[in-house]
Design a protein with these regions (language model features):
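Active-site-adjacent segment of FAD-dependent monooxygenases/related oxidoreductases
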Residues: 33-101, 121
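Glycine-rich phosphate/pyrophosphate-binding beta-alpha loops
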Residues: 258-263, 278-290, 326
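A conserved beta-strand/loop element that lines the FAD pocket in flavoprotein oxidoreductases
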Residues: 100-115
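Conserved FAD-binding catalytic core of PHBH/FMO-like flavoproteins
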Residues: 112, 123-137, 142-254, 258, ...
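Glycine-rich FAD pyrophosphate-binding loop
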Residues: 5-28
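C-terminal helical "tail/cap" subdomain of flavin- and related membrane-associated enzymes
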Residues: 301-405
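FAD-binding beta-loop-beta segment adjacent to the flavin cofactor pocket
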Residues: 256-273, 329-330, 347
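Generic enzyme active-site microenvironment
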Residues: 16-17, 145, 188, 274
Length: 405
C-alpha cells in the first residue's frame, strides 16, 4: 500500500490488489516506529496521522522477575517523533488508501485474490486474480509482491527461499485493560511452564498479549487446556488474573508460527518482492512492518522515474535488492542472536531464574539503551522520501499528455 501510494503520488499508474473485503485483521503488526513516522512527516501527512487514535511508547521496558528494566530510550533519536506509535494496522492502511485516492493514478481493488502470474516469454507481465464477480487478469510493466510471509506471488514465481531456524512461536490474544493496571512493560520475563516471555502492547482499552512459546509447543499447550494456559499467564501478570477469565475459547488465541527467511533473489524480469514476501522477519523488536515500509520507500525512490517512462529493467529491480539487502541481513542476524540468547538458552525455561545475557548487558551498561533504541526505532538503514509529488496539472492531464506507463 505504501509503495502504491508513493508511486501514484509520483505520477505512476498503480493498481493495488487486496485479498480481503477490508483491512481488519487482528494481531497484525500494529506498531509504527520512529523511522516510519519520519517518512510520514516527510510526506506532509504527520499531522493527519497523529489525529488517528493511537498510543505512544517513549521507552521500552521489561519486567525480569520483579525488577523493571528500561531496555530502550527513544528520547535521543534524531527524528521528529521520538516514540513508537501503537495503532491498529487497519487504521494505518485505511489512512494510506484514503490519501492515495487523492491521486487519479491510484486504484485499489478489494476482494481481489491473486492466484497466479501472467508470463510473456521470460518476463512476468501481470497477475490473475479472483473476485466475487469472477476471475480477471491485470497486465503491468511491473508486478510487486507485497503479500506477506505466505506470499502467493513469490511461490508462483518459483523464487528460492533461504530459511533460518527459529526456536519460538507466539500465541496472540486480548486481555481487557483495567484502570488500575500498571504502566506498560513491553515484556515480562517470568519463567512459566511453557511460556518463555509475555509481550503486552497497550491498545487503549485492552492489552494485546503475545505469549512466546517454544517452537512447536502449541499442540502441547492446547492439550493441557485453556484453564491451564490462563493460569500460566496469570502467574506472569497477576494484575490481569480477573480479566483473563474472559478468555473462554481457543478461537480467541491465534498462533503465529514464527519464521525467519529471505529470498536469494528478490526479482525476476517484470517482478519484485518486498517486505515479508522478500524476507520474513522475527517478531523480535516488532520491526517487521517498519522494514517493509523502508523497502517501499527505497523501491519508489529507485523506480518511480523509470516506471513513469516505461523503461524499468531487471538491473533496476536488482538495485532495490542491493539497496535493502544489507540492512535486512543485519537485522535478521540481530534478531536470531536475541532469539537464541533470550528464548533458547534459558530465558524462561521451567525453573530457570537466570537473566538473559542481553538484559544483563543492558543493566550493566545503561548507554546500550540508546543502541537498542536505535535498532528498534531506526534500523540499520532508514530510508527517506526522494520522490517528488507531481503537481496537480500533471495528475489532471488528459491521458494522451501523460508519459507512457
Amino acid at each position: 500500500m505504501m509503495l502504491g501510494f508513493l508511486l501514484a503520488r509520483a505520477g505512476v499508474e498503480v493498481l493495488v490488489l487486496e485479498k480481503h473485503a477490508d483491512f481488519f485483521r487482528d494481531f497484525r503488526g500494529d506498531t509504527l516506529h520512529p523511522s516510519s513516522l519520519e517518512v510520514i512527516h516527510e510526506l506532509g501527512l504527520l499531522e493527519d496521522f497523529l489525529r488517528l487514535p493511537h498510543t505512544e511508547l517513549r521507552e521500552a521496558r521489561g519486567m525480569i522477575g520483579e525488577e523493571t528494566l528500561t531496555l530502550a530510550d527513544f528520547s535521543r533519536l534524531p527524528v521528529r517523533c521520538k516514540f513508537i506509535a501503537m495503532i491498529p494496522q487497519w487504521d494505518f492502511l485505511n489512512f494510506l488508501a484514503e490519501h492515495g485516492r487523492r491521486y487519479p493514478k491510484f486504484r485499489l481493488r478489494m476482494q481481489a485474490d491473486v492466484t497466479d502470474l501472467v508470463r510473456e516469454g521470460n518476463r512476468i507481465a501481470g497477475v490473475r486474480a479472483t473476485t466475487p464477480s469472477g476471475e480477471f487478469e491485470a497486465r503491468a510493466q511491473l508486478v510487486v509482491g507485497a503479500d506477506g510471509r505466505h506470499s502467493t506471488v513469490r511461490e508462483r514465481a518459483g523464487l528460492e527461499v533461504l530459511e533460518f531456524g527459529v526456536p519460538i512461536d507466539v500465541f496472540w490474544f486480548r486481555i481487557a485493560k483495567n484502570a488500575d493496571d500498571p504502566q506498560q512493560a513491553l515484556g515480562y520475563f517470568r519463567p512459566g511452564k511453557t511460556v518463555r516471555m509475555l509481550v503486552m502492547l497497550d491498545r487503549g482499552d485492552y492489552w494485546q498479549a503475545g505469549a512466546v512459546i517454544p517452537k512447536g509447543a502449541g499442540e502441547q499447550i492446547h492439550a493441557r487446556g485453556l484453564a491451564a494456559f490462563r493460569e500460566e499467564i496469570a502467574r506472569i501478570v497477576p494484575f490481569a488474573r480477573a480479566s483473563l477469565e474472559a478468555l473462554a475459547d481457543w478461537d480467541e488465541v491465534k498462533l503465529l508460527t514464527v519464521k525467519v527467511d529471505r529470498l536469494r533473489e528478490w526479482h525476476l524480469p517484470g517482478l519484485l518482492c518486498i517486505g515479508d514476501a522478500a524476507h520474513a522477519m522475527s517478531p523480535v523488536g516488532g520491526i517487521g512492518i517498519n522494514i517493509a515500509l523502508q523497502d517501499a520507500v527505497a523501491a519508489a525512490n529507485l523506480l518511480a522515474e523509470k516506471l513513469r517512462a516505461g523503461s524499468v529493467g531487471e538491473d533496476d529491480l536488482r538495485a532495490v535488492q542491493r539497496r535493502r539487502e544489507r540492512a535486512v541481513r543485519m537485522t535478521q542476524a540481530v534478531q536470531i542472536f536475541v532469539q537464541n540468547r533470550v528464548f533458547q538458552s534459558g530465558a524462561g525455561g521451567q525453573g530457570s531464574g537466570s537473566v538473559p545475557l542481553p538484559m544483563r548487558l543492558i543493566r550493566a551498561f545503561p548507554f546500550l539503551r540508546r543502541l537498542v533504541a536505535r535498532f528498534i526505532g531506526m534500523g540499520f538503514q532508514p530510508e527517506h522520501v526522494r520522490t517528488r509529488e507531481l503537481p496537480a496539472e500533471y495528475h489532471n492531464a488528459t491521458p494522451t499528455s501523460r508519459p507512457a506507463r
